[in-house]
């Protein structure tokens, strides 16, 4: 007769349970060893008793390497297979979010341009009006500031041009003053030369004309007509020479 079929359920007797655990554990470890030797397989076995005691078997020298290999083969493939699906799902959610924002911005732009205002209620219209007023004030403020900046630049250029004009005017006045000074000095020098050399020339001319009356030297009797001519000549030269008569002719 063979052994009867054992019902698989928890053994209630504590002693029998411990005996059965020890027998089956040893048999399991033996089967794992036989499998690794007969089939050249990498086998690792980990068993914990109900009290938390550890029993293990590993066909290799390091249990951790076998566990790392098991983790890569099991959980790594799951992560690799699930990664594209998760990325696709996240990308689709991001797409839906961006699409909603894009449609909202398009609707706001049309409302700002005065289009599609029918679906808006009174509160939304008031909010749109306040938004437009704020935008208009900001535009006017920026425009005013731009005009003030331009005015300031033009005033600065005006001051620069006025300073340059003033400098050129002063330079022109200095040049005109120097020119008048040189012209006045030239006229005064010419008058002094005329005054200095005018009278001696007249005197010398009178002297030469008086000597031309009778160039010959005579001793004794002189012709009376020649004396009269000399007197007339001396009188004419004295009138031309401003009344100057040499002393030897008197």
UniProtKB/Swiss-Prot annotation:
Q: Which GO terms describe its cellular component?
A: nucleus
Any one GO BP annotation for this protein: cell differentiation
Taking every annotated instance into account, which residue ranges of this chain make up the domain K-box? 88-178
UniProt-annotated location(s)? Nucleus
Where does the MADS-box domain start and stop, copy by copy? 3-57
Q: Which UniProt keywords apply?
A: Activator, Coiled coil, Developmental protein, Differentiation, DNA-binding, Flowering, Nucleus, Transcription, Transcription regulation
**Would the keyword Zinc be found if you checked this record's keyword annotation?**
no
What PROSITE patterns would the database entry show?
K_BOX, MADS_BOX_1, MADS_BOX_2
Q: What is its main location?
A: nucleus
Return the SMART domains for the record.
MADS
Knockout mutant characteristics: Triple mutations in the SEP1, SEP2 and SEP3 genes result in the replacement of the stamens and petals by sepals and of the carpels by a new mutant flower with sepaloid organs.
GO MF annotation terms: DNA-binding transcription factor activity; protein dimerization activity; RNA polymerase II transcription regulatory region sequence-specific DNA binding
Kindly give the InterPro entries that the UniProt entry links to this protein. Answer: MADS-box/MEF2_TF, MEF2-like_N, TF_Kbox, TF_MADSbox, TF_MADSbox_sf
Entry annotated with the keyword Transcription = yes
- Domain of life, source organism: Eukaryota
Q: Which PANTHER family match?
A: SERUM RESPONSE FACTOR HOMOLOG
Q: How does it assemble?
A: Heterodimer with AGAMOUS capable of binding to CArG-box sequences. Interacts with TT16/AGL32.
Instruction: Describe its function.
Output: Probable transcription factor. Functions with SEPALLATA1/AGL2 and SEPALLATA3/AGL9 to ensure proper development of petals, stamens and carpels and to prevent the indeterminate growth of the flower meristem. Forms a heterodimer via the K-box domain with AG, that could be involved in genes regulation during floral meristem development.
This chain belongs to the protein called Developmental protein SEPALLATA 2
Q: Which organism's genome codes for this protein?
A: Arabidopsis thaliana (Mouse-ear cress)
